[in-house]
Regions:
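Catalytic alpha-helical scaffold of carbohydrate-active enzymes acting on polysaccharides/glycoconjugates
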Residues: 2-195, 220-243, 249-291
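A conserved mid-domain beta-alpha-beta active-site/ligand-binding segment of alpha/beta enzyme cores
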Residues: 197-229
Length: 291
C-alpha cells in the first residue's frame, strides 16, 4: 500500500489541538537504540574508511567502533539516565538479547520500555521474509523480557510498501519510521490502525555526529534550539520532542556531557516531562477516543 493510501494530508494548523493532562506542556521522548552488527556483512555505518577506500570483510575497525558502544558507551549512558531519572524507549535488534544479555537485563531491571528494531541491522528491503523476521524479533524480545513489544523502528527506518501491514498483523501498535509530523498520526493498514509517533532526524546522534560530522557540543546546542521552538508552540497545542541516542556515538567521553546537559536543561523547564513511546501512545489513543 502506498503511503498516500495510508494517511490523508492534514495541515497542522487546521486540526483540533491535542492536549496533555493539566500541568504538562511538552513531552520529551528519549530513545536509546541498541543494535547488532554482523561482522560477516558490511557494517551499518563507518567511522573510518580502509586504505584505498575499498571496504573489506571482515571490517574489524568499524565493527569495533560499534562494539565499544555496547561494552562501554551503553553503561555510561545508563548511569546518566539513572541519575536524571529518565526511562527511555529502548529500541533494540532482537539479537541483542542473545549477544549482549547483560545489557538487556539492565534495561529490564530499570523498567525501560523495549521496542522492536528487527532482528539485526539489515534493511527491511533485504529480508527474504519480512513477516517471519518481524515475528521472530518480537518473540525473542517477549521471551527475554516477558512483554511483547508495542512499538517498532525499522533498521535505518526502512520499510517496503508492505512492511506496515506485516507489523500490524504481528500486533505492533506504533512505529517511529514515518518522520513526517510533530504530532502522532494514525496510519491505515490491511489489519488494524498503527500510530506513527513523532520521531525526528534533527536531534539524532547518527545524523548530527556520523553524517553531518558536527562538533560534539552541537548535541546540546541543536537540542536546545529545537526545544525552544517547540516549547513556545506548546502554549497552543501539545508538543513532543524526541532525542535519539546510540551508545557508540552518544556514549563516548567527549559527547556524554553535552547529552546530559541537554536533558538537564530541557527537563528543568516548567511543564516538561519525559515519557516513553508506550505512554505517548496511550495518551494519544485516549485523546482520539474523546474526539
Amino acid at each position: 500500500m502506498h503511503p498516500r493510501e495510508r494517511l490523508d494530508y492534514s495541515p497542522i494548523d487546521r486540526r483540533p489541538p491535542l492536549r496533555f493532562p493539566e500541568g504538562i506542556r511538552l513531552v520529551l521522548w528519549p530513545l536509546l537504540a541498541l543494535e547488532e552488527w554482523d561482522l560477516s556483512r558490511p557494517m551499518a555505518r563507518m567511522v573510518i574508511s580502509p586504505p584505498q577506500g575499498q571496504p573489506q570483510l571482515p571490517d574489524l575497525p568499524n565493527w569495533s567502533w560499534h562494539e565499544y558502544g555496547m561494552r562501554v558507551g551503553f553503561w555510561r549512558l545508563k548511569k546518566m539516565l539513572e541519575r536524571l531519572r529518565i526511562s527511555p524507549t529502548v529500541t533494540l535488534n532482537a539479537k541483542v538479547c542473545e549477544t549482549y544479555p547483560q545489557v538487556i537485563e539492565a534495561c529490564i531491571d530499570n523498567g525501560w520500555e523495549l521496542n522492536a528494531h528487527s532482528y539485526d541491522q539489515v534493511p527491511m528491503h533485504k529480508l527474504d521474509d519480512q513477516r517471519a523476521t518481524i515475528n521472530k524479533s518480537m518473540d525473542i524480545i517477549e521471551r527475554f523480557s516477558g512483554r511483547r513489544p508495542r512499538g517498532w523502528f525499522g533498521p535505518g527506518l526502512t520499510q517496503t510498501f508492505d512492511t506496515l501491514d506485516y507489523l500490524a498483523e504481528a500486533g505492533i501498535e506504533y512505529i517511529g519510521d514515518w518522520v513526517l509530523d510533530d504530532e502522532p498520526v494514525t496510519l491505515k493498514t490491511a489489519h488494524r490502525p498503527v500510530v506513527a509517533l513523532p520521531y525526528n532526524f534533527e536531534i539524532h546522534d547518527i545524523v548530527m555526529m556520523a553524517l553531518q560530522q558536527h562538533p560534539s557540543d552541537v548535541m546540546y546546542s541543536r537540542a536546545l534550539d529545537q526545544f525552544r521552538c517547540l516549547y513556545d508552540e506548546a502554549s497552543e497545542r501539545a508538543k513532543i520532542m524526541a532525542i535519539a541516542c546510540h551508545p557508540y556515538l552518544s556514549g563516548v567521553p567527549h559527547r556524554i556531557a553535552h547529552v546530559q546537559r541537554a536533558f538537564e536543561e530541557i527537563l528543568g523547564h516548567p511543564g516538561v516531562v519525559a515519557w516513553d513511546g508506550a505512554k505517548i501512545l496511550d495518551w494519544y489513543l485516549a485523546q482520539s477516543e474523546r474526539r
